[in-house]
Amino acid sequence: MQITDTKIAIYGAGAMGTVLGALLTKGGLKNVHLITRNETHTKAMQDTGARIVCVAENTEFTVKVQARTPAQITDKYDVVFLMTKQRENVKTLEFLKDYLSADGIVCTTQNGLPEQSVANVLGAEKAYGAVASFGATFVGEGSVLLTSKWQGMRMQVSGYENDNAKQGLLLEILSFAGKAIDNTAFAQKADNLQGARWSKLAINSAFSGLSVVTGKTFGEIAKKRKSKKVALGILRECMDVATAQGVVLEKMQGHDMQKLLGGRSFLKTKLALFLLPIAMRKHKKLVSGMLKDIEKGRKCEIDYINGVVSKEGKRLGVPTPLCDKVVELAHGIENGLYEISEKNLDFFEI
């Protein structure tokens, strides 16, 4: 099959999904369908295209895309990039079964550790993962803000407990996104998928988790004395659980997180606290997507971020009191027991 004949779905074309679908289309792939339950977003993309605004570089483009709601799907896809929230994974994957070609695969880009859920429903041979290293915010029907620089965008892909036979196909598909922005490094092999997952999970648990319960940006969390101490503690809990799993953390932005932040001596802790604001400088204006969910009255996916660290820690006998507290507070906020406030930091013993 020619790559141009490959049928591709972006299932969950919110902020990140719209960016990926727009780039693949702009790069030259014509069989890319952007699928979302948001009917007004779908119609806007059908009428005027997908508009991507790169705030870091003050540039933008609009590209005509093929947008669908789930009810409008009629095709069977060779590759589905799963970009929804994890809370409904089983239901979503059961639905997608009928829309996969005989040897079709699902590549999940979700945060946390999502590949196992794909394998459970579809079988390990159809389960692939991608770690997406870019940020985006949904701002209106048909329009998305990209919070990363074009040349800084990356996607690392690999199979999950299978022979990785479709990794080459995924890399070729994603190379078209790279072509759209002259970024030859966009598509990359993930030689250590779980290491990359855990590195990103550690960052998300520390900063996205605390952003949910405090309402603060990542930069504010990394700057203020109490919050950055809690963030460092969460990062270390994630490192400890990953190590107990036998996972070697991948470098983040070229830096060895374990080496820079993992040391527990007084001097190494002091250095780590000094480095946190520097490390988060590029992401200082971000707030958690989970915070936005809660503000809109939705349940967030804290159980799949800090919650999965707590779950794995309990299974392996590794204490995770800080992650446990983030989960407790986030659910308390969802249920009206707590308010989103910086005062919630007082609940953390550090």
Language-model regions, residue ranges each:
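Nucleotide donor/acceptor-binding cores
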Residues: T6, D78, M153
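NAD(P)+-binding Rossmann beta1-loop-alpha1 motif at the extreme N-terminus of oxidoreductases
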Residues: M1-N58
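NAD(P)-dependent Rossmann-like dehydrogenase/reductase catalytic/cofactor-binding core
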Residues: Q2-T4, L232-I350
